[in-house]
Amino acid sequence: MVSKKVYFLTSNPHKAKEVSDVLSQFSIEVVPLKGEKLEIQADSVEEVARFAAEEAKKRFKERPLLLEDSGLFVDALKGFPGPYSNYVYRTLGLEGLLKLMEGVEDRRARFVCAAALVKEDDKIVIEVGEVEGEIAYEPRGDKGFGFDPIFVPLGYEKTFAELGEEVKKRISHRARAFMKIAKHLSGE
């Protein structure tokens, strides 16, 4: 039974499904809202998400409104690609990032998601979710998207793309951020 409906601004159907899977556990229905979120170049996904939420609340009337920004932060690359992950994925791809990691022993990395909620009263709430892990030596698996085939979450031997949706919707950075958002939605 659905107790609440929210709108999720994204152009990525994979993210829409992941967020829907997470929030459905809290009886929250996610309605994808087509449109581009306006982004700034910033050093943190939180800054990008906050700016995008401020802009989205001016352009869209639907409430509550959700959006997110996320990034892969690789320790040996001083946090790169971080908030530029989408651009790096589109231009360099998995192989390009792996090339940057050639000969690098320190494979530690983390995915960070900043989920933004524009509430009924137009107040903005930002919640952050993180998952620690490491960069694999080659792409593995076909169940994910983005950098999932090269990210092995801490405590696992498989990449996100090998683990699949059932595990990812419990442990991913996006799942962790939106589980926190669910508490705000339940209390509204």
Swiss-Prot record:
Keywords: Hydrolase, Magnesium, Metal-binding, Nucleotide metabolism, Nucleotide-binding. Pfam families: Ham1p_like. InterPro entries: dITP/XTP_pyrophosphatase, ITPase-like_fam, RdgB/HAM1. One of its GO terms (cellular component) is cytoplasm. It catalyses: XTP + H2O = XMP + diphosphate + H(+); dITP + H2O = dIMP + diphosphate + H(+); ITP + H2O = IMP + diphosphate + H(+). The keyword Cell cycle does not apply. The keyword Protein transport does not apply. The active site is at residue 69. Its EC number is 3.6.1.66. SUPFAM superfamilies: ITPase-like. Substrate binds at residues 10-15, 70, 145-148, 168, 173-174. Binds 1 Mg(2+) ion per subunit. HAMAP family: Non_canon_purine_NTPase. Belongs to the HAM1 NTPase family. Pyrophosphatase that catalyzes the hydrolysis of nucleoside triphosphates to their monophosphate derivatives, with a high preference for the non-canonical purine nucleotides XTP (xanthosine triphosphate), dITP (deoxyinosine triphosphate) and ITP. Seems to function as a house-cleaning enzyme that removes non-canonical purine nucleotides from the nucleotide pool, thus preventing their incorporation into DNA/RNA and avoiding chromosomal lesions. Homodimer. This is dITP/XTP pyrophosphatase. It comes from Ignicoccus hospitalis (strain KIN4/I / DSM 18386 / JCM 14125).
